[in-house]
Each structure stands twice: as structure tokens, then as C-alpha cells.
């Protein structure tokens, strides 16, 4: 049965994974966010899929993993995380992949899971301890989808494109 599941997963390797589960969690001074992708929202919203994502995130936080490769190698259940994902892929018949992982360490970290839907999560770290402000900033990050923290981290191409959009919008408003 396991070999059959691996064969199914291999056949689906060229398919697009446009849905999935994103989870974020903070334990003491360590926070992590992880994304496990799949093909359909039906699978993404399933309890087993969300539990697998949660189990992988729990293992990553317990090990204080810093990279996605470290996470993939962590023991989750009776196998490593990557094998657990492949096994779940064989069960559902959908392509699945661990797609993203990021951590923050230190004080003043706030995490946010938008409407507890497990599709849009953020984590932020402030210079000062202010839970309410941190929560509001994390919500704004989710709502506004910023491209950078400050101007120095924005590419020149993005600046040029944004300027062109702003100029075009201003011209349209002047014509009205």
C-alpha cells in the first residue's frame, strides 16, 4: 500500500499546488510559519491535512529548525516530514509539497492566523513589548500584503512600476 501511494505521488509531481494550509505558532521566544501546499481546497480544508501541517510545525518548533531542509528531515510520526507529506499525497491522490518555512527568534513576537482559516498567517517582531500593537501590525501585514519593510529593501524595478501606476492613476483622477 505504501509503495502504491509513492507511485501515485510520483505520477502527480508535475501538477500545480495552488491550495494548501499555512500555520503560524509561537512558543516562548521562537515563532515559525509553515506552508504545506496541495491541489484542491477540499484536501486543504481536511482535518488530516491540517493536522499533518500542525504536526510538522510542532516538530520544527520543538527542534528550533531554521530552514525548510531542516524541517523536511525532522521526525514526524514514524518517518521524516518529507516522507509523511509523500505518504499523505499517496492517500489523497494529490500532489503535496512543503513550500515555505520562516522563523523569528527573540522577544516581542506576535503571530496572526486570519480568521483561523489557515490560509493567511503572519508573524511580526517589535522593538518594544506591546502585544496589542504587535497584533494590530500582524493584522495589517495580512491585510495590506506589503512588498518590503522599508524603501531600501524594494527593488528599483518595483519602485519604477509603482511610480508608473501612481502617475497613471493621478492622471485618470485629474481627467475626471
Describe the residue ranges of each PLM region.
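N-terminal assembly/interaction segments in proteins that build large macromolecular machines
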Residues: 1-176
